[in-house]
Amino acid sequence: MTDKSQAPEVDVNEQIAQRKAKLSALRDKGIAFPNDFRRDSLAADLHAEYDNLSKEELAEKGIRVKVAGRMMTRRIMGKASFATIQDMSGKIQLYVARDNLPEGYYNTEFKKWDLGDILGASGTLFITGTGELSVQVDEVRLLTKALRPLPDKFHGLSDQEMRYRQRYLDLITNEESRSTFMARSKIIDYIRRFLSDRQFLEVETPMMQAIPGGAAARPFSTHHNALDMELFLRIAPELYLKRLVVGGFEKVFEINRNFRNEGLSTRHNPEFTMLEFYWAYADYHDLMDLTEQMLRGAAESVLGSAQFTSQGVDYDFGKPFERMTVLEAIVKYMPEVSLEQLNDMNTATEIAEQVGVSVKPSWGLGKVQIEIFETVAEHRLIQPTFITAYPAEVSPLARRHDDNPFVTDRFEFFAGGRELANGFSELNDAEDQAERFREQVEQKEAGDDEAMFYDEDYVTALEHGMPPTAGQGIGIDRLVMLLTDSASIRDVLLFPHMRPKAD
């Protein structure tokens, strides 16, 4: 008899009723949810240390352990059972024999427990006849009674939307999902250590701001009752981090949430995690070098290699990353046009319309060029690539290039046809910054909801003097997607935003 064959035969509501009755009986006996069991071992650690020992070597050592976890499988074979429990690290098998437990306990207690219940067990490690490391149990306790059954073991949680809505069930039943989120944690931990080891100071800046700045995006708004003022969830921490550079914190970083009131897609979630860091006395070339080193190291640290496959595409982060300008990328993927044509407003407008871009009257040449780039080239940037020389028109916070003030000392990093990072030598000319803010206000008044607000306090900070600085933002969620072979941003967010479930 096995628990696997029982679950599909019983209606879920009936199973819940049966489990609640069992819980009621536990309450009658005393403490139904004990909290006095202390484990001393995790499944993965036991496998790592003892899997390679022979039966005889392990028996000679007489290793006693205390383990705990959720019961995922059970095979009842008369006077003995095999059960598998799952903890945060993996699974370990229990061998539960009637004669090793107090009289009557096996039949009146253990056999009445259900899959999904959380157990604590003590016993001695041994290796079964099939070679599996197991615990020969001499004490086993029910720590938490699960009132709802787990999804069918053979089919798992197959409904993709349900996996997102009930992530806890996804994590219980889907080892791949657990591995993805463990990898996410390792990636963030690596980045944090990488920057800290280079004397970057981790800081925290406001999540609610009176003026949403630092990016071109539509913000979420809220109301502060005590101050009777409108506030915005931040779209980026950039302007606050640069205030810290003005204040003398010359190398700072923050890993935190940003919020943008925009659409949902496989690449976008309104709430997302960003790394932003700022480095005084450095320029955008230094940033590209540091970013290349950091991303290569992240792949090697988490995946064990700078060469990996994601969504069927082979990537090589071990080679030097390609670098080219916005216009060079357009010409590469649209060789029938020339740099001269792209630098002429009338011709560039014609090219944009040829590729399906609807040019708005308020756009300048720089905006037209970027729209062409995003349509023609962006999705083709598969291998790691830095794109440089972004027009000043679409880069209101970036420093102008010394030799060509039409463009800025800015780059974006792409891999897999997606933008993963945006960085530039920072604009530290207060008067130029004020003028660009005014241009953004004009664009907002012309109907651009994503144009920036005028931030007078930030301009005042710049007037006190900010050293030459470079800064960058990296989308953690998209980076995790790439390094974990995930198709959707929802696969790397524990609790992605979802539409309310219909009744």
Curated annotation (Swiss-Prot):
Binds 3 Mg(2+) ions per subunit. Its cofactor is Mg(2+). Keywords: Aminoacyl-tRNA synthetase, ATP-binding, Cytoplasm, Ligase, Magnesium, Metal-binding, Nucleotide-binding, Protein biosynthesis. Its EC number is 6.1.1.6. It is found in: Cytoplasm. Mg(2+) 1 binds at E412, E419. NCBIfam families: lysS_bact, PRK00484.1. Belongs to the class-II aminoacyl-tRNA synthetase family. This is Lysine--tRNA ligase.
